[in-house]
Regions:
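Basic, Lys/Arg- and aromatic-enriched nucleic-acid-binding interface segment
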Residues: 69, 88-91, 95-142, 146, ...
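C-terminal catalytic core of tyrosine-transesterase DNA break-rejoin enzymes
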Residues: 84, 130-133, 137, 143-144, ...
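N-terminal core-binding DNA-recognition domain of tyrosine site-specific recombinases/integrases
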Residues: 3-4, 8-80, 216-221, 236-239
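C-terminal secondary-structure termini that scaffold catalytic or DNA-interacting sites
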Residues: 170, 174-181, 188-190, 291-300
Length: 300
């Protein structure tokens, strides 16, 4: 049996065991980086050298360590499936080792409050301007922001209990984790912007998406408007997810308790918030240096 035929059955096996949003990402990555490479191979004829050649091919793509690790786990899972389902004899599997770790420098970017105010002036369109205000001032994940409906707004509080897959068919689904279900507070100014946007719709239903009305916004269109605004404001572009980083960094730099930030972001553990966001807290670093310089050490 060739690799591609076996992969179709494997994908059905995986699909029945995971959420739609997770599977759509898995399907994309597995198809792009594994099936496309092995599609002409027969699963019975795979050798350790074939797998090593694939690892070299992937290594040459200069992906991150974490992404390489994901791809390795995907391929290993497929091989184990073939071993059980089709009795393929892969005695070499114990020698199929993970990718070697490379030294990585974190590529993290975000907008400061001053930069965001400059960025937001680049919008003429009320819908997309309000969307990015929401992203920056709530820290919601992009899929969560796109999924917000009018019924989710109650005064200064917004209920986050669903998400939209950014890479698939834009279907509504449950949030990333149980902790992602949350209620977050919004400022009066953001509430006013949201109300103005909702009032602009010709006919309004509580089941309308706040951003888009009958249908949610498309990620490609959001990015197109973002790039236009960046060009107009003469500021570098950051990813949609980095607006979430921007919000977290804004809170950290204003000395908001890490537990409150973690809950607001929908993290299941405070350690996740610390690992992901504290490296960008430059103001805290400045305070640390100032404190150290002010300390008089008694050496004797």
């Amino acid at each position: 049996m060739n690799f591609k035929e076996a992969s179709i059955l494997y994908m059905e096996y995986v699909k029945n065991r995971h959420k739609k949003q997770w599977f759509s990402v898995f399907d994309y990555n597995f198809s792009k980086n594994i099936i496309s490479y092995f599609e002409t191979f027969n699963i019975e004829d795979l050798s350790l050298n074939d797998l090593k050649d694939w690892k070299k091919f992937i290594s040459d793509q200069d992906f991150s360590n974490s992404y390489n690790s994901q791809l390795y786990s995907m391929l290993l899972g497929f091989l184990e499936f073939c071993s059980k389902k089709y009795n393929c004899c892969y005695e070499f599997l114990p020698d199929f080792l993970p990718f070697d770790k490379r030294i990585e420098y974190k590529k993290t970017d975000f907008y400061t409050l001053k930069e965001f105010k400059r960025f937001i002036k680049g919008f003429d369109n009320q819908l997309y301007k309000t969307f990015f205000e929401f992203m920056f001032y709530t820290g919601c994940r992009p899929g969560e922001a796109m999924a917000i409906k009018i019924r989710d707004i109650n005064g200064n509080f917004i209920t986050v209990n669903k998400t939209i897959d950014e890479h698939g068919k834009r279907e509504l689904g449950t949030p990333k984790t149980y902790s992602s279900n949350r209620t977050i507070y919004i400022s009066n100014s953001l509430k006013k912007s949201l109300n103005n946007l909702i009032s602009s719709y010709d006919c309004m239903s509580l089941d309308y998406f706040v951003f888009g009305g009958v249908k949610p916004l498309a990620p490609t269109t959001i990015n197109r408007y973002k790039l236009k605004a960046c060009e107009k404001a003469n500021i570098r572009s950051i990813t949609l997810h980095q607006f979430r980083h921007s919000h977290a960094t804004l809170l950290l730099n204003n000395d908001i308790d890490i537990h409150i930030i973690s809950n607001r972001l929908g993290h299941s553990r405070v350690s996740t918030t610390l690992d992901v966001y504290t490296h960008s807290n430059f103001n805290q670093e400045k305070r640390l240096i100032k404190s150290l310089n002010s300390i008089k050490f008694n050496l004797f």
